[in-house]
Design a protein with these regions (language model features):
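Transmembrane helix-loop-helix hairpins in multi-pass inner-membrane proteins
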Residues: 1-44, 101-216, 301, 305-368
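Membrane-interface helix starts
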Residues: 13-19, 52-62, 237-251
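Helix-boundary and loop/linker segments of multi-pass membrane transporters
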Residues: 47-55, 84-87, 235-243, 278-279
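Membrane-embedded helical hairpins/re-entrant loop segments and their flanking transmembrane helices
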Residues: 72-97, 269-288
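Hydrophobic/aromatic residues in alpha-helical transmembrane segments
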Residues: 73-78, 115, 261-268, 291, ...
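Alpha-helical transmembrane segments of multi-pass membrane proteins
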Residues: 89-100, 128, 282-294, 323-331
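Juxtamembrane inter-helical linkers in multi-pass membrane proteins
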Residues: 94-100, 206-232
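Alpha-helical transmembrane segments and their immediate interhelical loop/hinge regions
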Residues: 223-273
Length: 368
């Protein structure tokens, strides 16, 4: 799972950074132009619906604070997972770079291998680094696979899923509702496998997965798959003996990060909502956003570029003034996604200068 330095630096090529920007803005721009032509409204009237008021400024400022809350949650999570051996500033650098690599990779790929590499360069053993990354993946999976149904305790499930019934995806050849259940089912299967491999029967899962990967049909993925299987077993040794207080703290930090992430979108909606949003509206927006994040897992584009913006317009069109849903989607991504593409380069330059040449043979914490 550990990346090489050369592979890491390749991620910072101009092409890798520009690709998600071009894809996202290109798809949205084309769709936005089509909707504008279809509506027949003068461009001036459409732009007037984005009138900035004191209310808009307040909510957008709050959205920026929610992004800070999100990053703080992940920094706190990383501090807990490393037994507070990493400084806050180091945690911030790792989180920002982790987000950068997630932004330039398809959602299903993410930046796990790069995250392990960065932690190893911070003098954390490969075993502990692997355990940390698998723990974050596990907690994220638990959070956003369960949230749509937790939200349905407060908001009718029919209201949460209503827009998906009428959206057809040419990529899937069917409704987005089917796409959601396919993505959710795959994530649940993956989550169950993680629980079994990390906590319930790590040696049994290791044995079966190793033999499965020996089949001829998996020969192209065998080498990488065997590394992953061994990484899971290593991580399980580190995690199974953790006390309840550890899991409570790391879950609170994870929840804080995801709540901050979700409330960014709520703030963007509230900034330009035709009428003030009620508590029910905010809960409904959270429920639909949980659906959106799962649908985004299907995206083959870097950082779900294009898919995230279109999904926003499909799911939240009834929250926004007519004709401006895609514009709000772009604003949402300008706050929550594109900054990481910009921040990544200077942060990486600083990080490489600080850690390059570190002796990883003397780990600061962790297991071998």
């Amino acid at each position: 799972m550990v990346a090489k330095t050369s592979e890491l630096l390749k991620q910072f090529s101009p092409g890798r950074i520009l690709l998600p920007v071009v894809l996202g803005l290109g798809i949205v721009g084309y769709t936005l132009y089509g909707e504008w032509v279809k509506s027949g409204l003068p461009m001036g009237e459409v732009l007037d619906r984005f009138a900035w008021t004191s209310r808009s400024v307040f909510w957008i400022a709050l959205a920026l604070l929610m992004m800070m809350l999100r990053d703080f949650g992940y920094m706190w999570q990383l501090r807990i997972l490393t037994d507070r051996k990493l400084e806050w500033r180091t945690c911030l650098e790792i989180i920002l770079l982790w987000d950068f690599f997630a932004a330039v990779s398809p959602s299903m790929v993410g930046g796990a291998a790069v995250a392990v590499f960065m932690l190893v360069k911070e003098q954390i053993s490969i075993g502990r680094s692997t355990a940390i990354v698998f723990t974050t993946v596990f907690l994220d999976q638990v959070f956003y696979t369960s949230l749509p149904f937790f939200a349905s305790l407060f908001v009718p499930q029919a209201d949460i899923f209503a827009p998906l019934h009428y959206i057809r995806s040419e990529l899937l050849g069917t409704s987005m509702m089917v796409g959601f259940w396919v993505a959710w089912g795959g994530l649940v299967v993956y989550l169950i496998l993680l629980i079994a491999a990390l906590f319930v029967a790590p040696h049994w899962i290791n044995w079966w997965l190793t033999r499965l990967l020996m089949l001829r049909m998996f020969r192209f993925w065998r080498s990488r798959g065997l590394h992953m299987v061994n990484d899971l077993l290593t991580a399980s040794r580190d995690l199974r003996d953790r006390k309840s207080i550890f899991w409570f703290q790391v879950w609170v930090a994870t929840s804080l990060a995801w709540i901050g992430r979700y409330l960014v979108l709520n703030c963007v909606l509230a900034a330009f909502s035709p009428v003030p949003m009620t508590l029910f509206d905010h809960l409904l927006a959270i429920g639909r956003q949980a659906v959106l994040w799962i649908v985004m897992v299907l995206s083959p584009t870097p950082g779900s570029a294009g898919v995230a913006e279109l999904g926003f317009s499909w799911l939240f069109g009834d929250f926004a003034p007519a004709g401006v849903a895609l514009g709000l989607a772009i604003l949402w991504r300008l706050i929550s996604y594109y900054p990481y593409l910009i921040i990544g380069v200077p942060v990486m330059t600083r990080w490489v200068k600080r850690v390059y040449g570190s002796d990883v043979r003397q780990p600061r914490i962790g297991i071998d």
